[in-house]
Design a protein with these regions (language model features):
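Flexible glycine/acidic-rich beta-alpha junction loops that bind and position SAM and/or redox cofactors
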Residues: 47-53, 66-95, 106-110, 115, ...
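Radical SAM/AdoMet-radical enzyme domain recognition
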Residues: 1-72, 89
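Extended aliphatic helical segments
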Residues: 3-6, 32, 39, 46, ...
Length: 163
């Protein structure tokens, strides 16, 4: 089951889906399969700029060993890749995400990013800002209403920098 994050950030990443609907679908799946079928399921997510600050919460919500964090789906040059994440957010995520089979590759990637940290260039920030502005305009929403505080502040500061 693909899920990237909990709460309002889920609603931003998975627009137009609602977090409450996700919970309802999981409850339905559990009620249908409980004791009747031998069906097991796990969760997968794609770590990215928008959700890295929230992954520890997601992991605790779903169970660390039921969540596989696939960090290879966003190319490094993508505006939403982990290479765009500020150092302090990476450090916090590293402390917050539990080390287990489903997160070991991500944790090693974060450690590598921190060891070789280079802040995003102005050109990268411009691409990120433009992409977020296009998303928000198209969806008639605003990132400030959905994303976690440090990520939201980083985007706001980036908008100021490139304007």
């Amino acid at each position: 089951i693909s899920v990237d994050v909990v709460g309002s950030t889920y609603e931003y990443i998975r627009y137009p889906y609602r977090w409450d609907n996700f919970n309802d679908r999981i409850r339905l799946l559990e009620s249908v399969t409980r004791g009747k079928y031998d069906i097991s399921y796990d969760f997968t997510c794609v770590p990215q700029l928008f959700n890295i600050e929230n992954l520890g919460r997601l992991q605790r919500r779903l169970g660390a060993n039921k969540l596989y964090m696939n960090n290879i789906l966003h190319p490094d040059d993508n505006y939403n890749s982990l290479k765009m994440v500020p150092e302090h957010i990476l450090e916090t995520a590293l402390k917050d995400i539990e080390y287990c089979t489903g997160s070991n590759i991500l944790i090693n990637s974060i450690k590598s990013l921190l060891a070789n940290y280079s802040p995003p260039t102005v050109a990268q920030l411009k691409i990120m800002v433009k992409s977020i502005q296009v998303l928000d305009l198209h969806r008639k929403q605003h990132y400030k209403d959905y994303l976690e505080p440090h990520t939201r502040d980083f985007i706001t500061e980036s908008i100021r920098k490139v304007s």
